[in-house]
Swiss-Prot record:
Belongs to the inovirus G3P protein family. Residues 1-18 form the signal peptide. It comes from Enterobacteria phage fd. The gene is III. It comes from the Viruses. Plays essential roles both in the penetration of the viral genome into the bacterial host via pilus retraction and in the extrusion process. During the initial step of infection, G3P mediates adsorption of the phage to its primary receptor, the tip of host F-pilus. Attachment of the phage causes pilus retraction bringing the viral particle into close proximity of the host cell inner membrane. This is Attachment protein G3P. Residues 86-105, 235-273 have a biased composition (Gly residues). Residues 142-228 are annotated as: N2. It is a single-pass type I membrane protein. Residues 253-262 are annotated as: Not essential for gene 3 function. Consists of 3 domains (N1/D1, N2/D2, and CT) separated by glycine-rich repeats and a C-terminal transmembrane segment. The N2 domain interacts with the F pilus, whereas the N1 domain forms a complex with the C-terminal domain of TolA at later stages of the infection process. The C-terminal domain is required for release of viral particles from the host bacterial membrane and proper integration of G3P and G6P proteins in the virion. Disulfide bonds join 25-54, 64-71, 206-219. Pfam families: Phage_Coat_A (PF05357).
Length: 424
């Protein structure tokens, strides 16, 4: 008896329920972490895990171990944790034992027909006015680039709650010509939103918030199982206990991490592997790289840096030209040439010696113009004659014009020949 009393504190916390609510779970921040006991949805290929009483969905680039039961990524809370002991293994067992759909009696809350006193809701029966809360007379469909999260299947239709309305997947729509983009279309079918409070694949509870009725209507709901999420995807074997054995079957729905049921026998197990979703990873990378991109800010930053570099280079070039000019004109060695004062002091007058004076002796003596004087032939002779300056200046002008024209034609012909050779 003492041993039994000693074991009670160990058993009670293990089976205690979390005090989390849907609102508190959704308010939790995203976390980049590695979670264990991960399962994957076969249809959407999304990965899920229970942590601290909440259900988490892996987003972004997800890296998993070989058996895909431990994954690293950006985990986002999407609702309450899925109970891990509600039907497992091969779903066999004894009376009220292993599995909600096993060999024993089905628990009434998981029945396929409504329980007396409970309300059965069919979202497709048209009893609710179509449309959205914003515009009930015009149900505008929403277009999604990829299949959204938090959808559920009912009567072979995929539903989603959006902006207080229940929407149904109505196929794909293409838009644009270059490129052509394909969208997933969800059309409102009711002004009431539905949610599954337990995320266990059986819609036990639903709440309808109507745009036409301020009071929310809460009901018990009996329907088909959900496709997202439906733990465990990698369901393993295991048999429920004997008569009365197991709370609802062996294994934590095939997880294998906690052995048998909460009170019954059976060993959880199993493993699974799936295909890597390259498209989903590409979309996640694209979103992560572009979500904070500000084209105007990037252009402004690049322009500012280029202007700064250009200003620095311009100042350096102007300073160097000034130093060379001062050195050539005898104003002393400054700036980049200040370090050569000691060597230049040994030459002439040091840094005050204009360098140009040393080169002028090597320059050719160019002809200088003189004042025009009349040209006289045979001065003092009987055949003496002269040419006045006005005629000489006229000849100079005409001859200079001919030289200019000839020079222009020569230069033009030279460049034209170069261009012709390049084209050929």
């Amino acid at each position: 008896m003492k041993k039994l009393l000693f074991a009670i504190p160990l058993v009670v916390p293990f089976y205690s329920h979390s005090a989390e609510t849907v609102e508190s779970c959704l308010a939790k921040p995203h976390t980049e972490n590695s979670f264990t006991n991960v399962w994957k949805d076969d249809k959407t290929l999304d990965r899920y895990a229970n942590y601290e009483g909440c259900l988490w969905n892996a987003t972004g680039v997800v890296v998993c171990t070989g058996d895909e039961t431990q994954c690293y990524g950006t985990w986002v809370p999407i609702g309450l944790a899925i109970p891990e002991n509600e039907g497992g293994g091969s779903e066999g067992g004894g009376s009220e034992g292993g599995g909600s759909e096993g060999g024993g009696t089905k628990p009434p809350e998981y029945g396929d027909t409504p329980i007396p006193g409970y309300t059965y809701i069919n979202p497709l029966d048209g009893t609710y006015p179509p449309g959205t809360e914003q515009n009930p007379a015009n149900p505008n469909p929403s277009l999604e680039e990829s299949q959204p999260l938090n959808t559920f299947m009912f009567q072979n239709n995929r539903f989603r709650n959006r902006q207080g309305a229940l929407t149904v997947y109505t196929g794909t729509v293409t838009q644009g010509t270059d490129p052509v983009k394909t969208y997933y279309q969800y059309t409102p079918v009711s002004s009431k939103a539905m949610y599954d409070a337990y995320w266990n694949g059986k819609f036990r509870d639903c709440a309808f918030h109507s745009g036409f009725n301020e009071d929310p209507f809460v009901c018990e709901y009996q329907g088909q199982s959900s496709d997202l999420p439906q733990p465990p995807v990698n369901a393993g074997g295991g048999s429920g206990g004997g008569s009365g054995g197991g709370s609802e079957g062996g294994g934590s729905e095939g997880g294998g991490s906690e052995g048998g049921g909460s009170e019954g026998g059976g060993s959880g197990g199993g493993s699974g592997s799936g295909d890597f979703d390259y498209e989903k990873m590409a979309n996640a990378n694209k979103g992560a790289m572009t979500e904070n991109a500000d084209e105007n800010a990037l252009q402004s930053d690049a322009k500012g840096k280029l202007d700064s570099v250009a200003t620095d280079y311009g100042a350096a070039i102007d300073g160097f030209i000034g130093d060379v000019s001062g050195l050539a004109n005898g104003n002393g060695a400054t700036g980049d040439f200040a370090g050569s004062n000691s060597q230049m002091a040994q030459v002439g007058d040091g840094d005050n010696s204009p360098l140009m004076n040393n080169f002028r002796q090597y320059l050719p003596s160019l002809p200088q113009s003189v004042e025009c004087r009349p040209y006289v032939f045979g001065a003092g002779k009987p055949y003496e004659f002269s040419i006045d300056c006005d005629k000489i200046n006229l000849f100079r002008g005409v001859f200079a014009f001919l030289l200019y024209v000839a020079t222009f034609m020569y230069v033009f012909s030279t460049f034209a020949n170069i261009l012709r050779n390049k084209e050929s």
